Amino acid sequence: MKKTIFLAAYVAACGIAFANTDTLTFVRELDEVVVNAPVAQVTNNHVALTNEQLNQSNTGQNLPFLLSATPALVATSDDGLGVGYTYFRIRGTDHTRINMTLNNVPLNDSESQTVFWVNMTDMASSMSSLNIQRGVGTSTNGSASFGASINMQTGNQCWESGVEDKSRYELSFNGGMYNTFREMVNAHIVLPNQWRANARFSKVNSDGFLYRTASDLYSYYGDLGWYGIKTKVIARFFGGSEKTGMGWDGVDYNTAYGIDGADRRYNPAGEYTTTAADGSDSTAYYPNQTDNYAQQHAQLTLIHRLSTRWNLSATAHYTHGAGYYEQYKRKKLSYWGLLGNGQLAIGNGQLAIGEDRKAYGMYRKHLDNHFFGGVVAAKYISEPVDVQLGGAANYYIGDHFGTLNYLEDSLIVPINYEYYRNDAKKTDANIYAKANWRIINRAQEQLSLYADLQYRYVRYERNGMNDEDMTDLPLKVDFHFFNPKAGLTYQNRGHLLSASFAIANREPSRNNYKENVVYDAATGEYIGLPHAERLYDYEVGYTYSHQRFAVGANLYWMDYDNQLVLTGEYNDVGAYKTKNVKDSYRMGAEVTAGVKIADWLRWDGNLVASRNKILNYHQYIDLYDDQDNWNWVGQDSVVGTTTIAFSPTITASSLFTFDVAGFTATVQTNVVSKQYLDNTEDENAMLRAYSTTNLHLQYQLPMQQWCKMDNAPDIRLLCQINNIFNAKYANNGGAEASRFMDGSRCCWYYAQAGINVHAG
């Protein structure tokens, strides 16, 4: 604890990351260019990043790790490097509850409500901007924002604002430890008659820090647009494919933290035991314990200026994704629904009904989905009131099915035997109205009041077998949500004061249903049906910006009704389980600062202190004798006010930037305090506090000076050293809802790489 406090104090003293001194004007300009972008109000809980800022240290890690210096954000990865499956939490809220849009089109998967960055590796290279609004933020499309909203824009923003009219081409290559390589080619092309195009292809490969977590990834992006004076039409196509080795099983505490010489790269996924002819046992690993998925997106956007006051935008979109993951595991036969159904034979005889023994099997779980719809917005600009009206209607179709391909010990099943299938449909529609009233609008003083009203309708239907327990689970639920928001901002000679209040509602995800609900076919009743959540978000903040420095603070109170919190347990695909808790809250203070010490030196940073609690929490814990025998002894319970799982009380980030004569060096330090793995506040089920420091070096060769030509190529050399102090840490994990008589817990952790170097 003392170490955590010391590190946090050091970061606060040294300076903290991404102060918004240069982004406030950018936010307003972007809103005029792209009418339908849900750009945040200029407030203290907002970060705006350009393409250059996003990709400064991009050596192949996925987007969550490129955002790791932003306030209250904790990035996690399965492979330990941030190349394969990566996620993040903001203010302790996991990625499934953070609204993400790309060109105002929902990016969260309709059922899981997750964004899988591994399907679109290196997407940051095609982004022109990224805005993070912590808290509820303004109305946007797709899933509700319960911790933050992230809006991303692709293409070349300069063309949309009419600033740039030059073709540019980019080729990037870098490689590093654990056989990590990234190749990228990018083109921004000026065509005749106001046509413009962007095209990119990226390839990323890595062995991963953990054994057998290799990633084989590619992604592409292309757009073609006509940029007229009053009208813009842009067609976008992008997507990618991934094959990654599984790393979501986790390891025990000693292995994750390298205690007693344990191999931190150990990965139990695909592990099984073979018996030789002499009766001796040995450990082997299934070579194709992998996740395989491909996703394609298409968007068509029209932006038209109807008059000097009215702007209109509309986007039609379509997304298709398909894939599977393959595992070789020892399971009970009932897991595959094989008892007494006539599908399974041993030799020439049928398996006896009721004989539920274990066997190794190779099986696949498949997903094939389609998502399509449209979004529209109209903006009226006047003095002193701007009004924006908009809405969206989206539809999702998803098919889930599992196939069993092999069983050990001469257990015979038909080829590609399908042991479950279920399908889902989801309708998501919303309409909203926003108004911004500039009460005072002088050169040095502005006072604005905004209001934002949204109605959202959701229908979720599913039919078929629940793969959790092989029972039928038909479901049809409707939700009607009203989400009001209001805020006030005051600016005067560098001072910015803001206050806001918002209500957000969110429907349960597919996992919330299939892991908690039991359907009684006889009565038609549902047992354990999860409730929709509601959030009341209060924010107040202050920022002062000077030519050489900026400092700000934001206070928030997020009051939840029926929040679905992570329990620490996860299912067989590595997704965390959740449960409703009636009363809970998150409160905190976010401090940002930045100073330009000299023309060649600046530092920026943030410090977030928070309190995240569940009131009147009650959870039963199964008691067992020890980890060798697992004999059930009884039950214990946890009652009272507890800390919400995966919610650190302190996060902080420091960023020093040195820039001299084409040479740039940045030193980034992140601090994260301890996190509980479940909601019992048990010190035996906890992630230790950690601190990591990364060093980025870059040199831009003086090609114009050497070649004596203005259009000489731009060549930059870079070196990225992650975790330079070789910290042994884990940034994610989980815990069973059980305890042993000696007080120990059955937990798992995701070990992260020590020092690793990449250059290009």
Question: PLM features: residue spans?
Answer:
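Gram-negative outer-membrane beta-barrel transporters
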Residues: 557-559, 577-679
